[in-house]
Amino acid sequence: MNSTPYSIRQEPHDHPLVSAVLAVRNEERYIESVLQSLLLQDTSICDLEILVVDGDSSDATRQIVERIANRNARVRLLINHRRKTPYAFNLGIHAAKGEYICILGAHTTYAKDYIATCLRELHLHNAGGCSGVEIIRPSSDDFQARLIAWVLAHPFGTSTGSMRTRKAGFSDTIPYPIFLKSTLTEVGAYDIQLHRNQDNDLSQRLRARGHKLYLTDRTYCEYFVSPTLASLSKYAFKTGFWNIISFKKNRASMSLRHFVPGVFVAGLLLCLVAFVSAISAPEHTRLWFRLPLLSLIIAYVIASFGAAFNIASRERDATAFLTPLIFLTLHTCYGVGVLTAVAINARLPSCDPGLLVEKTVDS
């Protein structure tokens, strides 16, 4: 990380309170380590409260949070009956006492200087929002988990425009950001109709109001990916599906890269139809019916094995040559999600704008 010292003028004033908002549901595996990383945050330039917004967990998540909250007054538990992420974020923002809001994830641990550094960088770059670099980690030592982590961290898996592969600088969206609370309320906080991509939508609305978003390499967080191919497939399908819904709600929040897997799968299907049609075509034209599918397959194999070679060289691990299978799973499930949403004319869900907090745990 960049270690250039800060000047006094880059420090926020008056030791402000930062409210960290953490949306969770059934996160008993991760929640304790996440909270410990937050309780160990550097508070030399700010105070910190941690709002855990639980979406009616059916596992031990709530009990773990209550136990930690009973020992540490900085932790508060809120209940999100609607369960969806944007409701959780808005509940946290609504209940926050801080001048600043930090929106965090439950599968992630944070460097000790994460919040303090993002707060400094927010002021240094006169930004509307700031986050650190997101480092992708496997959630277990299983080789499948390693393959998934490598794929999600590689530009061929998630594109060079993804917040997981971008370099430091101003960006169109950022992971786990800190904002002035007034900046969030200015744009109406998160859109509760968007169960996914609510961060892209918020980022676009902030930029439209003139707020810049900055990604700093002075600090980092570690995101632990789901460890199985089944969970990756489900994640990819839902993401692709919601990209179409998000596009309908706010076209400016989505870019071409969000639809490339859909174009890939559509092209694959068309090429497959052409390939099968070659059976009934005149013999001298059959090659032309088969060539598009063969060309697409060859191009994808070259690209995916090129990415695999890059990963294997970096990690010094030959199992990386299995990543083409993971790339293919990610891209096809994502693309099928896009095409499914188009085929059924997927629409935004209805929503209840009300905020309801059933229980708050304070010690």
Outline where the language-model segments fall.
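Catalytic donor/gating beta->alpha subdomain of glycosyltransferases that bind UDP-sugars
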Residues: 138, 191-254
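Glycine-rich, basic loop-to-helix element that forms the pyrophosphate-binding segment
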Residues: 80-96, 117, 171, 175
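Membrane-embedded multi-pass helical conduit in multi-pass membrane proteins
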Residues: 264-347
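A conserved acidic beta->alpha catalytic loop
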Residues: 54-63, 108-109
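Conserved donor NDP-sugar-binding/catalytic core segment of glycosyltransferases
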Residues: 112-145, 220, 224
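Cell-envelope/extracellular polymer assembly enzymes that use nucleotide-activated donors
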Residues: 16-19, 49, 201
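Short, acidic, metal-binding catalytic loop of nucleotide-sugar glycosyltransferases
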Residues: 36-47
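Short aromatic/hydrophobic "clamp" motif used to bind/position activated sugar donors
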Residues: 101
